[in-house]
């Protein structure tokens, strides 16, 4: 207490008042701990009142470090103090809430807190460490220069609590360290961490692990700094890399015991991986030592893992870290795999993996086995089995990590991996025979893992067998292993895997063998089978439908379809969530196998799908799977009539129901399903769709206040306009309003300034479709729409909404350029200047952020047309506009820290609009070239073993390569993905209107190259070229300008 009293005196706070506040605080903290809800709630309100007083933080610090205080109060005070520092210490913090802690209070708190780092209660110690670290982030070194000396004294004090406290501070601090602090931190911390790490007789395992973690964090941070400041690594980390690496090599060789365990080795491996990833050149010389040792760790760990986890024939105690976290042995395995991934990512080390493939894959398969724990969980919970074994699972286990590694090596070395996998699997299967003969019950797990491994990368196996690159007895594997295992009762999980594996290899089967496997699969669906077998049978059916469609031999499936359908529907009735999703997905592909069969059972499939959709209306995954099934049924002409008779009245009644009578979100989903039906039905549409569904969706959209319903309603009307504008225009209500009038009403509502901006996220697509389909019939209405878009643009803040609105003008540039310019010049924008200036300023400041391949093409080609028109027609309306060019950085600014950004607001150059457009076109070309290059860089190109001659390359070469990215802004890096095909999986390229637009087919790289080459020939080009920066000139050089 003496320290606290002295600190209180130092702060000059008047005694009784301070005491009164402190007592109030203790009462309030006691209240927060009360079991009575009312007392608790009152105390939580009271703490908010106290939080804004000057002494609040000081009193929390005093209570936290008071050894005589009640433990519960001290713990709570330390947690609240941690939050207080985050929100009040510095006005530049992202979490800041006023008032800012006063200087006087800060001095006292900094004085008090380090005492809490010696605390014997670890929870208090950890909270104090967190608070100290958060303060240091803002105050060190300027306002708290002595902190590091204090921490270093604690590290050598011999007091275990103080060591742990100081290490906690350093761990937290280094995670958040800024690039301006790192040059002061690294030279002090890294040598100390080295000492702690290597002094095994002085420091405990967990403290030494933390020292390695701190080293790893610093290594990553310094590597990031190196991208912006060349030479940072040379000064900050290279001096210690060698000694650390040698110590790491020693540490990995230590047998487990008092000075080493799996948690410790995991941290060491993470550090080695960080060095290999970040500083490969420096690691080349140490690799000869490191590789054999990591390899030993991999192989020894495999045997240990199989004993303790897979078969559970041996019990072990997992180590626990200093915060009470259990460090499971699997964490060491993960870090070994991460190390191998790091080798694969670097051309210097890739060949080392290639050489070890046969052995590596042999061990990967060992790690892929099912563990006893998984068998227990999956047997008790079939939903978990589906989730864990799904391709897109969020679970992370050794089995999944091993699969990931197998897929990574198979992608990088296709031919070599096929050979290695065939060899490894053959060896495992032979060993399994011996294990089985010796009466061991776990022999089947290796069979299961081999089937999983071969099935996961089936195409490289089947291709290699076909081309004679590998000698693998495919027929023997299918009959003597997979088929034979189906007749054994070793484990339901082996049966299930065998069903799945067979479905992966139909290309290698005779029709008779396929028949046998299909028969087994249908039996596997039966209710008497264990859930894991039934679930695997569903997966296998999906595989057969998929494979047999590709090889155009679905006739083999036809006799089994009735039993498959019944089996799926029975299974869906018994399970929900994950299992149900799998069944629905499979049912959807079954619908596509034989349209005649599907039409004959529409009366089963459709009522079932409607029932599931209504029962699970709040589950978006089920809804979207139901939608997929309705889509398939819509495309089969014989199903359309009966399906619509069943489905449309259901959807209409949902749309007409009062909002409080149906589950939230159901109406929006029903509209989405209607959209799918309209899009996938050939016109003319039925009376049901035009006279009942259309008015229902229009009315529903106009009278809802739910954003999702409005958005989906707009998209649904767009489908109607796109598929059958004539029918929409011909339909009339009793008042004489036609369908087009309703569409206009909906557009006005989506653009209404009073509705949320998110309702406008897709309105651009609706308007563009409307203009392209009904352009001439819109007349006055078009002006009205464009005015509404302009006023919505003045409110919009989100990129997606702004892009949607700007795209309407981009489309009009293609079809009605002159009328558009005239219209925009006849209206004032927000500043009183013509609206054209407002639209172009908004567009050009966001073009580089637009996303979506189709949108990228529409807007880029529109910009070319505008530039061409501005020059050819000598159009002063465009030539006289000036817009924001590039951001101005002052040379003496150095790194832009948070405080600097706050003091110096952004400044921009001001350039002519047409110059800005040229710059944007060049930027689009650069992005699309990059995306195309990335797409063409197939694995084959990386396969060339180029690692041997690269070891000696000169420093300069590598530095030049790295320059490219450093100068890019995040927005540029994000924008480059606009044209990458796999960036958007489903969303917009499924948009039928986009696919029908000839612009979508354009080769943008060729178009922009051609445009720029022609533009550079024009006399005015000289005036433009003086505005281009070095990057832009470089891009033009690549196309010969």
From Swiss-Prot:
Pfam name, any one: HEAT_IPO9_c
Keywords: Acetylation, Chaperone, Cytoplasm, Nucleus, Protein transport, Transport
Biased composition (Acidic residues): 943-964
Region (Disordered): 936-967
Keyword GTP-binding in annotation: no
SMART domains from the UniProt entry: IBN_N
GO MF assignments: histone binding; histone chaperone activity; nuclear import signal receptor activity; small GTPase binding
Record's keyword annotation contains Phosphoprotein: no
GO biological process: proteasome localization; protein import into nucleus; protein stabilization; ribosome biogenesis
Domain of life: Eukaryota
Subunit structure: Interacts with histones H2A, H2B, H3 and H4. The binding is coupled to RanGTP cycles. Interacts with AKIRIN2; promoting association with pre-assembled proteasomes. Associates with pre-assembled proteasomes; interaction is indirect and mediated via interaction with AKIRIN2. Interacts with PPP2R1A and PPP2R1B.
Similarity field: Belongs to the importin beta family.
Name of the protein: Importin-9
Lineage: Eukaryota, Metazoa, Chordata, Craniata, Vertebrata
